[in-house]
Amino acid sequence: EILLDDARRLHEKLLASGCKSRLHIAPERWHAYVLYNLSENMEQDFSEINRFLTKVLSPAKSLRWMRLDNAAKIYPAAKRRNWTNFFRLSATLTEPVDTDVLRTALDVTVRRFPSIAVRLRRGVFWYYLEEISKAPAIEEDKSYPLVHVPFDDVRRCAFRVLVYKNRLAVEFFHAVTDGTGGLIFLKTLTAEYLSQKYGIQIPAERGVLGRLEDPDPEELEDSFLRYAGQITASRKEQTAYHLSGTPEPDGFLDLTTLMLPVDAVKAKAKEFGVSVTEFIAAVMMKAISDLQTEKVPRRMRRRPVKVLLPVNLRGLFPSRTLRNFASYVTPEIDPRLGDYSLAEICKIVHYRMGLENDARMMTAKIATNVASERSAVLRAMPLFIKNIAMKAVFDLVGECKSCLCLSNLGLVQLPDAMAPYVARMDFIIGVQAKAPHNCGVVSWDGTMYINMIRNIREPELESHFYRVLHTLGLPVKVESNQRWT
């Protein structure tokens, strides 16, 4: 359906080119339909239609650009030659993914997410994001997740879509979005794919956005700037125990997935009087503590055990942004003071989360980061000097302050029409620049998937983590891509 004058011109051109065409004019309307049949080898037909669609219906528009949000500014500066901060979300479907259908679904979806369908651009004073003009090519998934993405590729597109059999995966550069925003993108892409593939109607609910709607301006905002408080928080923290091992020489990432019944984990967490996230964090801290005890027999040489727990700030503030909007809490124990039981660690994690996972505390943390961004000295620095300064800050107060990051996206909810087509969900966060482990958690359809990734050969932490869960009587299934030599 197009404007009448345009329809008439297209109709006449199609007839002149030898096509069969009929013009249907809507009564008392300025619109019409053009029905046409193309003959074989009618290249001129296609060129005329393509010209009409691209030049008249979809004229070229200037590409949108956005400043990096407050949390994102550190990621381009912190990059290494063989490391960029990516994370992965994937949906395993009940049938093999049709890449042709997925390609058209991706074309629709990227237009709905102008803050994610972007590339990283370099300015004089800051990096910034620029909307991409078309969707990236769909790639075949590799033998392991989160294969290193060269920084030049991020400058072309800051996310990638990968397919392997039934699995549809999206990997995001962390400067673009966080786990919550990435999950909304994956849900919406999967919904559009299923709609096109099976002709089902999937409503815009439970994290699926309306694919043909215009983006809401609130989805594009930097919510850190909006909710920064007046009082700043201290960044002073002790350096944590550093996990180590034999690096994989070719950059291979070993992935171990532990699968547990959600109900069993909830029941066990309730026994300890903590939430599911607090329970999993306590188990991880217990595993790290046990591993350090083995490796460092002398108690006074041990370092604090700390796990960084991301907090989705959308739960504390009324934000709808699809960009980064998360902070963190870092519970810790100090093994030099003595041994800790799992119950004691659960109590420490619970009270630390209760103290810091609070809107007032978080506004102070946000204010600390925003104050740095607003510094007149930093703003005046050329980008190449900023990169040096920000990388030094990242090394000083970033990853060395925790053993690893444990991020739990919680229980995934999907529209009822969509759920029967999804067999599994996974969330994997890349290893840190200077630490060999990280852990992503997500639950779907009664199963919790704990994805532990590492860039060293020894699966020592995974073994200790499994041992703690097994000792508690929890049924655990394990799968791994580890190479046996």
Question: Model regions: which residues?
Answer:
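Long, internal scaffold/assembly segments composed of regular secondary structure
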Residues: 255-338, 343-347
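Long, Pro/Ser/Thr-rich low-complexity/intrinsically disordered regulatory tracts in eukaryotic proteins
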Residues: 80, 190, 304-310, 353
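Helical lid/core segments from catalytic subdomains that handle acyl or acyl-like groups
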Residues: 255, 324-412, 417
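Flexible, P/S/T/G-rich "lid" or insertion loops adjacent to the active sites of thioester-utilizing
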Residues: 221-274
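Non-catalytic N-terminal regions of enzymes
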Residues: 59-218, 265-270, 275-297, 400, ...
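Catalytic histidine neighborhood in serine/cysteine hydrolases
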Residues: 15-32
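Catalytic active-site module of serine/aspartate enzymes centered on a nucleophile-bearing elbow/loop
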Residues: 34-59
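Conserved alpha/beta-hydrolase "acid-adjacent" motif
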Residues: 2-9
